């Protein structure tokens, strides 16, 4: 796995192939949750994420970035939305890519992943004490971006 920057955007390359679309699929999302409970996997990823952050200005998203990976980050935002809204967004993303999916199943999967991640032994999903809570359930993507840019400018 390699992380590269192409045309100003971060790309995740697996065996030299750009797999950004693949890593955002529901299947990978669930596999991520299942494999993140293994200490050796978490340790390696923790090292890689911290190495990336030390060498670059980064914006990272993830379920334990503010509490475990980068606990001293300059700005931490606990970005959330209701399970139904996240399911709707994922459904629309998949539809745009031509992927058939079931909205109700996506929501069930999101709820199951949340439960699993909140209750895992190692680095459970939780808001960092110094993170800004931002519920985006009733916000458009443009509103979310505007809010985050405002928070960055204030930091």
Language-model features: where?
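N-terminal phosphate/diphosphate-binding loop that engages ATP/GTP or pyrophosphate donors
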Residues: 1-27
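Small-molecule kinase domains that catalyze NTP-dependent phosphoryl transfer to phosphate-bearing small molecules
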Residues: 4-6, 49-55, 63, 68, ...
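ATP-dependent NMP and nucleoside kinases share a basic, alpha-helical "lid"
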Residues: 20, 25-29, 36, 40-97
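C-terminal alpha-helix
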Residues: 147-155
